């Protein structure tokens, strides 16, 4: 009986942990705030900032992409942390 109970507890913990999905902001520059649920396995959000002839551009989303020189990138690991 104790073995069965322990097995059920372990299975529950594993299933709850695997079911977590990250939520990140995904609006661009000065648009209204919107969020997206990241695909499975993605555990970070990013915000990229750069300037061009239009002014300061901000891009947000899921993951932590590589960037070119001159682009500031911030990656973080909690829900909606990329505001």
Swiss-Prot record:
Question: CDD domains attached here?
Answer: TFP_snake_toxin
Cited Pfam families: Toxin_cobra-type (PF21947)
Sorted keywords for this record are: Acetylcholine receptor inhibiting toxin, Disulfide bond, Ion channel impairing toxin, Neurotoxin, Postsynaptic neurotoxin, Secreted, Signal, Toxin
Signal peptide residues on this chain, from the entry's feature table: 1-21
PROSITE patterns named in the record? SNAKE_TOXIN (PS00272)
Q: What is its main location?
A: secreted
Q: What InterPro entries does this protein's entry cite?
A: Snake_3FTx, Snake_toxin-like_sf, Snake_toxin_con_site, Toxin_cobra-type
Q: Which GO terms describe its cellular component?
A: extracellular region
- Tissue expression summary: Expressed by the venom gland.
Q: Name one GO molecular function term.
A: ion channel regulator activity
Extract the coiled-coil ranges from the record: none
Tell me, in a sentence or two, what this protein's role is. Answer: Binds to muscle nicotinic acetylcholine receptor (nAChR) and inhibit acetylcholine from binding to the receptor, thereby impairing neuromuscular transmission.
Under what name is this protein listed? Answer: Short neurotoxin 3FTx-Oxy3
